[in-house]
Amino acid sequence: MWTFPVDYDVIVIGAGHAGCEAAYCAAKMGASVLLLTSNLDTVAKLSCNPAVGGIGKGHIVREIDALGGIMAEITDLSGIQFRILNQTKGPAVRAPRAQVDKQLYHIHMKRLLEQVPGLHIMQGTAEALLDNGEKVLGVSTKEGWAYLGKTVVLSSGTFMRGLIHIGTQNFSGGRLGDAASLGLSEDLKRLGFPLGRLKTGTPARLLASSIDFSVMEEQPGDHNVCFVHRNEMFVPTLPQVSCHITHTTDQTKDLITKNLHRSALYGGRIEGVGPRYCPSIEDKIVKFADKDRHHIFIEPEGLNTQEVYVNGLSTSMPFDVQYDIIRSVSGLENAIITRPAYAIEYDYVHGNVIFPSLESKLIEGLFLCGQINGTTGYEEAAAQGLIAGVNAVNKVLRHPPFVPSRQESYIGVMLDDLTTQVLDEPYRMFTSRAEHRLLLRQDNAGMRLSHYGHSLGLLSSERYAMFQEQKACIEQEKERLSKTFRKYGDTVVPLTKVLCRPEVSYQQLLTEFPADVRDLGPVVGASLEMEIKYSGYISRQQTLIRSMERSENISIPEDIDYHSISALSLEAREKLSKFTPRTIGSAARISGISVADIQVLMVSLKKDAH
């Protein structure tokens, strides 16, 4: 087998959202990087919905931007509708979401990656890992040659032994129209990796000209919403479009109920578990039998195509049943299908063999990111890609790994969850997964994480200075307003007390007291308002974190023998040996580990220290 005459620092397998972020970040840190993809025309392809962000997910994209990644930038360039979700709810759960042009997203990402120094993008299909039994050495390809690298990042998406289901029909594929990867699964098994099966699905695509939008509710976008942190107002570069909302009918329910046995999911042909919070339409009908109808969202796939995505109508039914189901939906009576819905099963690796840095515990220098780790979603994948790419370079440079904590980021929450919990379904980020979500708002991601991005060499000095200036402005203005007393109603109070009132906004305060309130602009002003309005809650959460950190970050030796600690419960010995947590905090979050077990472990660590 011929070996390519370059020894790379980092080889990234797969150019989906995880792979693109990993390759970009590794190259930006100065590494020589190979990004290997089976098809250059599908780089950063949005395989399912044409959207980025949402609750929890939008927070992650903002964190990626704060660290110096690229998903936010590509989303803003490709966005054809921007919205803030949960506007009427508290600031912790408000999140940006964008409809994007699928083709432009791919084009912008590929063009950007092609311009990064040190990054070589190559078409080829990874067939097997090269290793010496302890350390990864590179990758061999289906085409018959090999690439050598000091580290390898595996971001295979749904391609590992991917199996597509449409009713009773099933066939191999990584997604509809693309071949599955068969060799990598076998190779990981050879190396001792425990594999499981998960399932996801995607709805049919329809021709917009065949849809009756007049009976649907129009859903326009919002103004000044974006993913890249800015000081100024954001004006989209592309024309903006609306989505539309419709619903299923009694006929839809009857059709699905009568044909349930023909569904790949309910017919017993799918062994993988699907995402709980993105169920197929047949799953909704069965699990929510008391509901007469379900919302369906019609989302445009781009500006230069008539295809639309039917959000909420994912299914693994046969095509003839899909046809009838779609035409039973209000406004879709004459809909023309351009692509069928399907479900897909794929292999993933259990989290107990992965460090929070996303390096494998079994083969040194091998990093895993994206759906191979059991997650679902472009955003979760991209965040893991950033972490894997950064830590692959840290490995080469012999620097300590970068692992943000769950107290300071949603990315940290995800890394901790993936490596301490047993997944029984695809992992999706929600704000409810974070214990301190009021501290992890989407508006303050830059102030929380930009110092990491700058120190890693991913975030420019100019952007870092912007974040530092924002942070300083907010702190200074909070201090000044707390010492500025004015009459409000019948009493004289500091202006911070006025802004704490639920009916008073920062803009109202600025209008009412123009001589006393500094105009920080709408972006920084909104963050200032949240910091002041929720200062009591924020202070309590910060106090709680400080008290927890004393035990949270106590290190556990890598060579500890849990089976020798007889006071631990049998379940604790088994679980701790399986997951090998690095800190007491991580150990405490493993399912089945009790407070008593943690106390025993801490006593044992103190004895060993003495």
From Swiss-Prot:
<keyword id="KW-0963">Cytoplasm</keyword>
<dbReference type="InterPro" id="IPR004416">
    <property type="entry name" value="MnmG"/>
</dbReference>
<dbReference type="Pfam" id="PF13932">
    <property type="entry name" value="SAM_GIDA_C"/>
</dbReference>
<dbReference type="InterPro" id="IPR020595">
    <property type="entry name" value="MnmG-rel_CS"/>
</dbReference>
<comment type="subunit">
    <text>Homodimer. Heterotetramer of two MnmE and two MnmG subunits.</text>
</comment>
<dbReference type="InterPro" id="IPR047001">
    <property type="entry name" value="MnmG_C_subdom"/>
</dbReference>
<dbReference type="GO" id="GO:0050660">
    <property type="term" value="F:flavin adenine dinucleotide binding"/>
</dbReference>
<comment type="function">
    <text>NAD-binding protein involved in the addition of a carboxymethylaminomethyl (cmnm) group at the wobble position (U34) of certain tRNAs, forming tRNA-cmnm(5)s(2)U34.</text>
</comment>
<feature type="binding site">
    <location>
        <begin position="274"/>
        <end position="288"/>
    </location>
    <ligand>
        <name>NAD(+)</name>
    </ligand>
</feature>
<dbReference type="InterPro" id="IPR026904">
    <property type="entry name" value="MnmG_C"/>
</dbReference>
<protein>
    <recommendedName>
        <fullName>tRNA uridine 5-carboxymethylaminomethyl modification enzyme MnmG</fullName>
    </recommendedName>
</protein>
<feature type="binding site">
    <location>
        <begin position="14"/>
        <end position="19"/>
    </location>
    <ligand>
        <name>FAD</name>
    </ligand>
</feature>
<dbReference type="Pfam" id="PF01134">
    <property type="entry name" value="GIDA"/>
</dbReference>
<comment type="similarity">
    <text>Belongs to the MnmG family.</text>
</comment>
<dbReference type="InterPro" id="IPR049312">
    <property type="entry name" value="GIDA_C_N"/>
</dbReference>
<keyword id="KW-0285">Flavoprotein</keyword>
<dbReference type="InterPro" id="IPR044920">
    <property type="entry name" value="MnmG_C_subdom_sf"/>
</dbReference>
<dbReference type="GO" id="GO:0030488">
    <property type="term" value="P:tRNA methylation"/>
</dbReference>
<dbReference type="GO" id="GO:0005829">
    <property type="term" value="C:cytosol"/>
</dbReference>
<dbReference type="InterPro" id="IPR036188">
    <property type="entry name" value="FAD/NAD-bd_sf"/>
</dbReference>
<keyword id="KW-0819">tRNA processing</keyword>
<dbReference type="InterPro" id="IPR040131">
    <property type="entry name" value="MnmG_N"/>
</dbReference>
<dbReference type="Pfam" id="PF21680">
    <property type="entry name" value="GIDA_C_1st"/>
</dbReference>
<dbReference type="InterPro" id="IPR002218">
    <property type="entry name" value="MnmG-rel"/>
</dbReference>
<dbReference type="GO" id="GO:0002098">
    <property type="term" value="P:tRNA wobble uridine modification"/>
</dbReference>
<keyword id="KW-0520">NAD</keyword>
<keyword id="KW-0274">FAD</keyword>
